[in-house]
Amino acid sequence: MPNNGKTDDQAALWNGTAGHAWVDAQALLDDMFRPFERLLVNAAAGAAPTGRVLDVGCGTGSTTRALARQLGPGSHCVGVDISAPMIAAARALARQEELVERTAFICADAQRQAFEREGFDAIVSRFGVMFFDDPVQAFMNLRHAARKDARLCFIAWRSAVENPYMTAAERAAAPLLPDMPVRQPDAPGQFGFAKVDRIRQILADSGWSAPSVQRLDVECTLAEKDLLTYLSRLGPLGRVLHQLDERTRRQAVEAARAAFDPFVHGQEVRYTAACWMVSARA
């Protein structure tokens, strides 16, 4: 099945600047998102009798590896991501942690990947399912990869309005950067699953049953010393900074850093992540 333009855009993004930035910031991002990882591991651990779990949009594989550690010898935890740099990092980290026998990492678009039919007891995702150009097709493909009654469990962001920390940098720098990409409602991206009715419709149309969508508010932290790396490498601002002249780049970073002052408490940056915890059955 041919990819369309949106899929090509996502592949280019996550195999380019954004993907390499995530690899470079892997440690700080994994630490910041550790609470979500724990929630997903706990949800999947009791739903995977044979230890076969698929992690969608696995990035550098932290959740995949955590599942493998929790499920123990004999488990088979598979991470899939469209980003080649992230998958390479995931494989390297699995080797480093001696988890190669329990893990596998696939560089592919989960919307179109030919997974083993009914091959998984559980399917999970930490912020990895909001980027499909055709979410119904994607979740149908994932359902075909799930065994009967297998559990789907993923975490997605609520709205940008409810997550001011996540948009602080781009909002502050926007007056200096008129060409910076603007987030579009319901488009593939971080806040693509902000609307609960949309999530429910996608799950229903793709054949999943017993959907549950719960509000999830999680306190997250980041070391203040890592804040400049975070705001200058990630998100819409991080993707355009390298295109700017030195003066404009410096002004944009200064404006963005000032916007984070309300979140800085001594040596720590704190914010509340407003998310959805979503589950369903195949």
Question: What are the residue ranges of the model-derived segments?
Answer:
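Conserved Class I S-adenosyl-L-methionine
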Residues: 2-4, 9, 13, 18-21, ...
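Conserved alpha-helix/loop element of class I SAM-dependent methyltransferases that forms part
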Residues: 31-51, 66
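Short glycine-dipeptide loop
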Residues: 50, 73-74, 146-152
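Class I SAM-dependent methyltransferase SAM/SAH-binding core
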Residues: 52-113, 137
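Conserved hydrophobic residues forming the short capping helix/wall of the S-adenosyl-L-methionine
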Residues: 71, 94, 173, 203, ...
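A short acidic, Gly/Pro-enriched loop at the edge of an enzyme's catalytic core
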Residues: 111-122
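A short SAM/SAH-binding and catalytic strip from SAM-dependent methyltransferases
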Residues: 121-135, 158
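Conserved catalytic/acceptor-binding region of the Class I
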Residues: 136, 143, 151-222
